[in-house]
């Protein structure tokens, strides 16, 4: 089954017929008067006439509807798919054109970039890090806040100049928008920026070779339909940084939480999990490549539930944290996150495991027990609070009160002594009063996070807040409150990080410090940056051998100073996770 058949099947289930018509027209009708010379020398008119001829004899609209109504198996890999009837196999090939990828936003977008590149690489495209030599520029975008989108609009204005200066002797420069912004602003992008050739939503990356082939005929092309089952489970992401020591492994996509402020369910679709077997296979391959850290990734990572294996389809139920509720009917059965975390941690004892981003409602004791017991699961938890006011949390539809959140924090710290905590906060949400703000300030002081991500509220269309609430906190008040939260966070983080001074910590070396070529930089268990001098030290596995630590090495570092974001220390020796876990680090 080729990509369009899957696309229309998903559309039949999730959107009105008019949207389907729009995408079909957007994909196949000419919207761009720019000529597109064929690399073999055919005229623009000849290419378009040939394309139109084959399109006329290709599938009809009714053909797509019939195909969409018949359940079909997804192919095991994108290579086995037949080309659409209106395109030849050769037209789906990249012909060694060079692709430049720019990534904005969250770590999911970093992983999406690796998935998109894996697909394009198999179609014959080449990767370039030089913007000037690119034939195709793809921006992997974010829509979580207005500022993120404005960054992309500004970037498009810069690329418009580059496209206009393109020498006629070269193939036309193609520009595409991928990811959440393509999903949210599809119509506006195509109408406002005629220089954008291609749009692909988060669930349409398999379709990139076809979309680029359509673009080569001189048209704009778009596929922004969300899927109910796409997880890219069969695609091995290509690491964009060959020297990296860590990698992100996407275990699920989409989100069902429907928090009132959040655009994610509308840009990334419903929650669906990858089969456990495919995740374990990817982690094994990363281990074989020598990577030393894997972060399991998802919008709501700890609500993972794999129902792909029949024998687990009717067992188990939702196990929410005490005092927490959901905005949706929890799925039943399947292999849960605790099972996945257990299996991943067994693959390579020398590979550190992290996960993000979780929801506080999904922290059963079996997950906490695994974190406590397994030496290679980092003792660090991201616990997004968003606000310290129960009234604001209710308006946000977070499913918990301040009291329930604080109780969970205490429970986690009892279960995992010394655990590092990080969190997200939004200030200036609809209806937030000064008292609500002060309650958030007090929560920051009470919990004392190691790391924090704090933002002023930015209303997003389609969200529940957009339709039912009023963005009534003035911008200057939002910014003032944000500055206050940042100040308090730094004060408290400095205090909690100062307790590490005098301790010896296991650090995974990432490379040289950005500020000094004589210092190395790495991260500890709590995911804090640790800076230490590049010096010869003993290798604990080979006494007497003097070595210099390299990226991917584990070293013991004695902490001598701390700030709100960074620890500094002296390197003691090179070690392994196993050896360090057998010794008490103090």
Curated annotation (Swiss-Prot):
Interacts with CDK5R1 (p35 form). CDK5RAP1, CDK5RAP2 and CDK5RAP3 show competitive binding to CDK5R1. Forms a complex with CDK5R1 and CDK5. Residues 498-573 form the TRAM domain. It comes from the Eukaryota. Its cofactor is [4Fe-4S] cluster. Keywords: 4Fe-4S, Iron, Iron-sulfur, Membrane, Metal-binding, Mitochondrion, Mitochondrion inner membrane, S-adenosyl-L-methionine, Transferase, Transit peptide, tRNA processing. Binds 2 [4Fe-4S] clusters. One cluster is coordinated with 3 cysteines and an exchangeable S-adenosyl-L-methionine. This is Mitochondrial tRNA methylthiotransferase CDK5RAP1. GO terms for cellular component: cytosol; mitochondrial inner membrane; mitochondrial matrix; mitochondrion; nucleoplasm. Expressed in brain. Residues 241-495 form the Radical SAM core domain. Methylthiotransferase that catalyzes the conversion of N6-(dimethylallyl)adenosine (i(6)A) to 2-methylthio-N6-(dimethylallyl)adenosine (ms(2)i(6)A) at position 37 (adjacent to the 3'-end of the anticodon) of four mitochondrial DNA-encoded tRNAs (Ser(UCN), Phe, Tyr and Trp). Essential for efficient and highly accurate protein translation by the ribosome. Specifically inhibits CDK5 activation by CDK5R1. Essential for efficient mitochondrial protein synthesis and respiratory chain. [4Fe-4S] cluster 1 binds at residues 106, 142, 180. The gene is Cdk5rap1. SUPFAM superfamilies: Radical SAM enzymes. Its main location: mitochondrion. Signal peptide: none annotated. GO terms for biological process: mitochondrial tRNA modification; negative regulation of cyclin-dependent protein serine/threonine kinase activity; positive regulation of mitochondrial translation; positive regulation of translational fidelity; regulation of cyclin-dependent protein serine/threonine kinase activity; RNA modification. Pfam families: Radical_SAM, TRAM, UPF0004. Gene3D superfamilies: Methylthiotransferase, N-terminal domain, tm_1862 like domain. [4Fe-4S] cluster 2 binds at residues 255, 259, 262. It is found in: Mitochondrion inner membrane.
């Amino acid at each position: 089954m080729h990509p369009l058949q899957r696309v229309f099947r998903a559309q039949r289930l999730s959107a009105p017929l008019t949207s389907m018509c729009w995408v079909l027209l957007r994909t196949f009708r000419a919207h761009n008067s720019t000529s597109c010379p064929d690399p073999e020398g055919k005229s623009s008119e000849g290419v378009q006439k040939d394309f139109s001829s084959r399109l006329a004899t290709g599938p009809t609209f009714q053909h797509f509807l019939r195909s969409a109504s018949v359940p079909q198996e997804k192919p095991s890999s994108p290579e086995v798919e037949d080309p659409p009837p209106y395109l030849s196999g050769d037209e789906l090939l990249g012909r060694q054109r060079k692709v430049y990828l720019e990534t904005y936003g969250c770590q999911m977008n970093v992983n999406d970039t690796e998935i998109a590149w894996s697909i394009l690489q198999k179609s014959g495209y080449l990767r370039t890090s030089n913007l000037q030599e690119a034939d195709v520029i793809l921006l992997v975008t974010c829509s979580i806040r207005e500022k993120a989108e404005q960054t992309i609009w500004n970037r498009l204005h810069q690329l418009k100049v580059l496209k206009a200066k393109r020498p006629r002797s070269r193939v036309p420069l193609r520009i595409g928008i991928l990811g959440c912004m393509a999903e949210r602003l599809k119509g506006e992008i195509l109408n406002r920026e005629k220089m954008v050739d291609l749009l692909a939503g988060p669930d349409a990356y398999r379709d990139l070779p076809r979309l680029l082939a359509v673009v080569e005929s001189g048209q704009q092309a778009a596929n922004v339909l969300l899927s109910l089952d796409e997880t890219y489970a069969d695609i091995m992401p290509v690491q964009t940084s060959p020297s990296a020591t860590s990698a992100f492994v996407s275990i699920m996509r989409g989100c069902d939480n429907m928090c009132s402020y959040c655009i994610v369910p509308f840009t990334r679709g419903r929650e669906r999990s990858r089969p456990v077997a495919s995740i374990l296979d990817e982690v094994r391959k990363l281990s074989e490549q020598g990577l030393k850290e894997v972060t399991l990734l998802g919008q709501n990572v700890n609500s993972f539930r794999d129902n792909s294996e029949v024998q687990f389809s009717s067992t188990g139920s939702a196990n929410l944290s005490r005092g927490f509720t959901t905005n949706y009917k929890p799925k039943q059965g399947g292999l849960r996150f605790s099972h996945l975390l257990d299996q991943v941690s067994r693959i390579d004892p020398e590979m550190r495991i992290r996960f993000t981003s979780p929801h506080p409602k999904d922290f059963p004791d079996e997950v906490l027990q695994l974190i406590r017991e397994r030496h290679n699961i980092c003792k660090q938890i991201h616990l997004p609070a968003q606000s310290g006011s129960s009234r604001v949390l209710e308006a946000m539809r977070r499913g918990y009160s301040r009291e329930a959140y604080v109780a969970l924090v205490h429970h986690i710290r009892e279960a995992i002594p010394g655990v590092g905590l990080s969190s997200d906060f939004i200030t200036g949400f609809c209806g937030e009063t000064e008292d609500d703000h002060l309650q958030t300030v007090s929560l920051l002081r009470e919990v004392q996070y190691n790391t924090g991500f704090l933002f002023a509220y930015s209303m997003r269309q389609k969200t529940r807040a957009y339709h039912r609430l009023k963005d009534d906190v003035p911008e200057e008040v939002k910014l003032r409150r944000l500055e206050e939260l940042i100040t308090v966070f730094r004060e408290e983080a400095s205090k909690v990080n100062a307790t590490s001074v005098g301790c010896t910590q296991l650090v995974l070396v990432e490379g040289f410090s950005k500020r000094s070529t004589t210092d190395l930089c790495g991260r500890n268990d709590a995911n804090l940056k640790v800076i230490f001098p590049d010096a010869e030290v003993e290798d604990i596995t080979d006494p007497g051998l003097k070595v210099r630590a390299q990226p991917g090495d584990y070293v013991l570092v004695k902490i001598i100073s701390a700030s709100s974001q960074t620890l500094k220390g002296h390197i003691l020796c090179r070690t392994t996770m196993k050896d360090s876990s057998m010794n008490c680090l103090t």
